[in-house]
């Protein structure tokens, strides 16, 4: 079995569902986070985060077979504090990347934080993550800062993070 996108059928909207994540989904989210990020957040950290009244989290699930159960393939977590919000983490597993699922998650999170009264939304993204940068720029995010050496690799390397911001006051 390969992990390329060619191994999977094209994804139609009827096969993708977005669900609001609850604290009870922390184990499931921790497994996804471990596939996507190093270091990964554990279930306890995610459970605590999901219990925060200012947090919003979405899980993307895909139905791979007409009658099969949906499989979690991505998630997004954000948090609102006063009139600002931040995307804490967003990711889609490799076989399902570049298929519109990240955009669905980002748009869902955008709507959630915008309706909560946040005026600006911020996030950090690795400077070299072209796919994520393309997504965020398409949504209107602009670079507002840079954090040198923010991301640490398992081999001791580091990568700069770009801080991106989005004005939510002009969003419908």
Enumerate the predicted regions with their spans:
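Short amphipathic helical patch at the helix-1/turn junction of helix-turn-helix
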Residues: 92, 126-127
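Conserved beta-strand edge residues that scaffold enzyme active sites
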Residues: 47, 64, 127-128, 150-151
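Short glycine/proline-centered loop/turn elements that form peptide/ligand docking sites
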Residues: 106, 129-132, 149-155
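Acetyl-CoA-dependent GNAT
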Residues: 3, 11-99, 103-112, 116, ...
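Conserved catalytic-core motifs of GNAT/GCN5-like acyltransferases
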Residues: 44, 122-124, 137, 142-159
């Amino acid at each position: 079995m390969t992990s390329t996108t060619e191994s999977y059928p094209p994804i139609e909207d009827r096969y993708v569902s977005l669900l609001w994540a609850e604290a009870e989904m922390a184990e499931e989210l921790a497994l996804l986070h471990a596939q996507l990020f190093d270091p990964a957040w554990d279930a306890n950290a995610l459970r605590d985060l999901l219990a925060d009244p200012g947090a919003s989290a979405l899980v993307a699930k895909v139905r791979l077979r007409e009658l099969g159960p949906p499989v979690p393939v991505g998630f997004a977590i954000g948090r609102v504090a006063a009139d600002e919000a931040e995307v804490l983490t967003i990711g889609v597993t490799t076989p399902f990347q570049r298929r519109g699922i990240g955009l669905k998650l980002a748009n869902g999170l955008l709507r959630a934080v915008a309706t909560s009264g946040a005026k600006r939304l911020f996030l950090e993204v690795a400077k070299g993550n072209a796919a994520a940068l393309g997504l965020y720029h398409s949504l209107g995010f602009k670079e507002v800062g840079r954090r040198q050496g923010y991301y640490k690799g398992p081999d001791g390397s580091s990568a700069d993070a770009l801080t991106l911001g989005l004005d939510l006051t002009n969003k419908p």
